[in-house]
């Protein structure tokens, strides 16, 4: 009964799920899996990654647009989720290669020899062959999936508890989240971090146990999984922000002191939002990087979290669908401009190459939206709907 009431009060949620489902079905039918070959496997991967970026953008919108916390660290949680699943993918793939290479030996290899061979394959690039402690569960898919949830959640909980109980707010909190991201990135860049330093984790697109499956089929599976995760995340956060908790959270955004005066434990609400959005960001990262095929520390540098805030601002913060629109719009445009799809512009005295000028265009768009369309693309959409009704 409660579920029907929630959906009845929020028809936009049903519309979003319906559009997402139709989109997924159409892409699947037009992909190489069905033989239609109207959408290439590489573009299916691009769409799948875009859905993951939409999910982390929703998380950012909830923590910033609804709660008023401008976090410049949520892409760090996104990266942690990618590293967590990437460790299992790389270990399992390397284990298969090592076992196959040792199969022809006259004497069976001992577990220690197998472990050393796997370690040398993974960590030889940084001059080591020993497994760090953080790889203790890398051979167990279930435990690594738990790490996708627990590590971002625990880090966000500890950071949030320390920051919110100290009543750090505004730009100071944003600086702290950015410092956390920078510290994590600098740690991961070190060769002795246990995660291969600047080399990162590679070969993540090869799913162990499905070596014979085509990349087209795998890309569709990840597209569907990403769509399901996006739909579930959208419904969950729509439920959160549309209820009593959402009213309190929006009150904290607008006037934290007044909400505190009314007797609400502001820190608990902020900690819940910060932690749950971090977990969702980790899940999005765990789905994104197997489609990207590689993850390295540069992926979670502070600039990535700034891009995330730009996506939400362009789409329209304080609107879940606005975050989706902003992330999808910017990420697809980025793929087009930086992937060679956009033609260069010859001005005679200078050739504008979009691979170099894309970030300038993105920054200009952000300034224009901030000055003239503060509610973003989502706000323009709301205006059009109201005029037609």
Cite the ranges covered by each PLM segment:
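Transmembrane alpha-helices and adjacent helix-loop boundaries
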Residues: 1-389
């Amino acid at each position: 009964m409660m579920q029907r009431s929630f959906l009845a009060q929020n028809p936009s949620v049903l519309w979003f799920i319906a559009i997402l489902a139709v989109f997924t079905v159409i892409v699947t039918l037009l992909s190489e899996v069905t033989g239609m070959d109207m959408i290439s496997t590489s573009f299916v991967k691009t769409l799948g990654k875009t859905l993951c970026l939409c999910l982390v953008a929703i998380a950012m919108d909830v923590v910033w647009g609804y709660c008023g916390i401008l976090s410049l660290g949520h892409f760090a949680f996104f990266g942690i989720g990618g590293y967590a699943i990437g460790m299992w993918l790389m270990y399992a793939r390397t284990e298969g290669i090592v076992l196959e290479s040792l199969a022809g030996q006259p004497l069976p290899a001992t577990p220690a020899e197998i472990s050393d061979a796997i370690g040398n394959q993974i960590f030889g690039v940084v001059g080591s062959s020993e497994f760090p402690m953080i790889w203790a569960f890398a051979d167990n898919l279930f435990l690594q999936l738990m790490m996708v949830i627990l590590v971002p959640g625990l880090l966000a909980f500890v950071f949030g508890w320390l920051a919110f109980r100290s009543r750090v707010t505004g730009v100071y909190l944003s600086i702290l989240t950015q410092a956390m991201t920078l510290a994590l990135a600098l740690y991961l860049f070190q060769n002795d971090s246990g995660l291969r330093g600047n080399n990162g984790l590679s070969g993540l697109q090869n799913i162990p146990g499905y070596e014979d499956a085509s990349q087209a089929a795998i890309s569709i599976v990840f597209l569907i999984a990403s769509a399901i995760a996006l739909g579930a995340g959208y419904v969950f956060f729509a439920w959160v922000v549309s209820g009593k908790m959402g009213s309190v959270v929006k009150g904290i955004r607008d006037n934290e002191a007044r909400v505190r005066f009314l007797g609400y434990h502001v820190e608990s609400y902020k900690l819940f939002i910060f932690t749950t959005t971090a977990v969702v960001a980790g899940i999005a990262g765990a789905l994104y990087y197997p489609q990207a095929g590689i993850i390295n520390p540069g992926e979670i540098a502070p600039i990535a979290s700034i891009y995330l805030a730009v996506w939400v601002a362009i789409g329209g913060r304080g609107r879940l669908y606005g975050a989706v629109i902003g992330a999808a719009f910017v990420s697809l445009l980025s793929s087009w401009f930086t992937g060679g799809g956009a033609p260069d512009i010859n001005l005679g005295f200078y050739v504008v190459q979009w691979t170099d000028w894309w970030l300038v265009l993105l920054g200009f768009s952000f300034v224009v939206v901030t000055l003239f369309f503060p509610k973003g693309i989502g706000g323009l959409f709301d205006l059009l709907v109201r005029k037609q009704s």
